[in-house]
């Protein structure tokens, strides 16, 4: 697993740093924060827009983030709504990527890694560890 976000654009690094700070301050039972998906692989889209059949469309990649926690995941998911709202407020003056969180208990992650469950082994291969 990679450990650095330095290859990502500066604006992305700033957004991820703010998200990580909000998560770490709000979720005491967080054991790991892992970026996965297009930003971790390097095939993300910062912003793309088109006009197709007279309709303007736009697209940007989101941040796929796995939170590995101890304790109840429902408690964490409620806090993530507040974290996401705060993040959007902080970056309201500019276009920014939307975070998508997956919350898993550490025992669930370990069990799935033991049986080589694709989702989790893919994260180990391609992910970027933001916090451990």
Regions found by a protein language model. Give the residues of each.
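Short, aliphatic-rich beta-strand segments
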Residues: 64-68
């Amino acid at each position: 697993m990679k450990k650095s976000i330095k290859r990502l654009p500066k604006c992305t690094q700033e957004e991820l740093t703010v998200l990580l700070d909000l998560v770490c301050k709000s979720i005491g039972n967080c054991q790991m924060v892992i970026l996965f998906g297009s930003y971790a692989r390097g095939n993300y889209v910062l912003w793309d827009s088109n006009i197709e059949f007279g309709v303007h469309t736009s697209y940007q990649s989101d941040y796929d983030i796995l939170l590995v926690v101890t304790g109840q995941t429902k408690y964490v998911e409620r806090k993530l709504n507040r974290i996401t709202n705060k993040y959007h407020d902080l970056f309201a003056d500019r276009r920014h990527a939307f975070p998508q969180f997956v919350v898993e208990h550490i025992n669930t992650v370990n069990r799935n890694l033991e049986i080589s469950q694709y989702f989790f082994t893919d994260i180990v291969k391609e992910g970027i560890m933001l916090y451990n």
